[in-house]
Amino acid sequence: MRMWGTAGTGARRLRSVGAGVVVWGAVAFGLASPSGASSAPTPVTQASTSSRGVSATTINVVFPLISFTSIEGQFEIESDAEYGEQTKAIHLFVDQINDAGGINGRKINPMIVSFDPTNVDEQRALCKQWTQGNPPVFAVLDGLGTWEGVNELCVTREGHTPMLAQWSTTTNWTDLGAPYLWWTGADDAPILAATVSWGVSSGRLGHGKKVGVVVSDQASDQDALNSYLMPDLKKVGIVPQVVTIAGAVDETAATDSDATLAVERLKAAGVQSVIPLLPDNAFTPYLGAETSQDYFPKLLLSDYQSEIEIALGLIPVPYEKALNGQQGVTAETLGGIDLPRPESQGGYDPGVRSCWTVWHKAYPQTPKGNINDDIEEQGPVQGWCQEIHLFAKAATMAGKDLNRRTFVEAMSRITDFPGGYSPVLSYGPDKFSGPTQYRVVEVHDNHPPTSLCKRGPATQPPAGVCWVVEQNWKPLPSS
């Protein structure tokens, strides 16, 4: 749906990950901070048998949306017309399920709830209302990854309510939320392991290279470093130089100063390859410091904190030299285009194509500001489509006796589900994140136009930037 030439092919909507809010909330709400040494997840066989939110004819399901009147909501709508289509998308795909007979005779009752992502107290109150108040709620679905961090744990760990969520971090988070928290986004633990493996095989790590890690001081990033990345590097005999940057969103001056010092240290040490573990509010100052000091090491980007996605939006300005040509690991279908052409030609994968077919039939007209009615390959419409159909699959498998235990047991049996952001989703009794594969992509500035970026409609100009697939799908390492 986006205008070709103004964005990269297959671009997804981006938003910051509130690492600082995640950690603050975990402490304030009495939850354990994430730790790689967390206790084993609660088995699905020990889930609650409560059927709260389920009646003889309906299933109450919450769909949280960032308020369109909030600052972030207004920004998203201005930058992406499809973002404003979310309510239509939710009703369309819920109606598709209900009109086909529902789930074992029950209809999904969609409860679409707007929230301000900057209002922590409001989010906490909403969570408690859903999990303890009226009307009762059976499940929460988040197709875009906006109900993030500790909010996931409020619903699942505290509220014992099933949640399907696109926002993800490392394995310890689903351990805390088990057996109710199920991610459609990739677990970052195997993503980091894949980053190290690819780094070694591509010559970016090892082979005499000096390696650095730039990480924020936020507890979630420190845990990713110490519990996951450092052990992965140790296995291949790499001892990196680690530099830390302030990562809280309200520490702008400290972040800028730390970024400058971090680059000075890495440059002075002759570091050639850098693995960033940074939220975007620290990632961009770090790139600015690289640029101002004319220091451009190889960056090993990844889905961690959405760095590989964010990077595409930062070229050709302001960080062309720092990012153009950099590569990274992703479990998402980056590198395709927003067209219902064959997948082999860069078009929709089967899951997204099925979503587009339903959307196109209902809304064949071209939305204002777009050139066609094609949905974004990584956009809001397919995100909600994926989450709703995955929920319906598990709820149907749970049978007539739908309760929390039968639902999560059904989720643990789902394999090879056609995904949206990722091609395939597979789960298990102790596998709470669906993606199973990763690819390596390059951030590419397409000025002047080249054949590296897949073309959209022939009548439209080529994309200005794109992800170029450098290595296609391989299995993610076991987490």
Model-derived regions: residue spans:
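C-terminal region of N-terminal signal peptides and the immediate post-cleavage residues
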Residues: 27-47
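N-terminal extracellular/periplasmic Venus flytrap/periplasmic-binding protein-like
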Residues: 40-130
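Solvent-exposed, acidic/polar segments of extracytosolic/periplasmic ligand-binding ectodomains
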Residues: 43-48, 52, 324, 412-479
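Extracytoplasmic ligand/sensor domains, especially the bilobed periplasmic-binding protein
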Residues: 137-244, 298-327, 331
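Short, charged, surface-exposed loops that flank catalytic or proteolytic processing sites
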Residues: 368, 372-375, 396-409
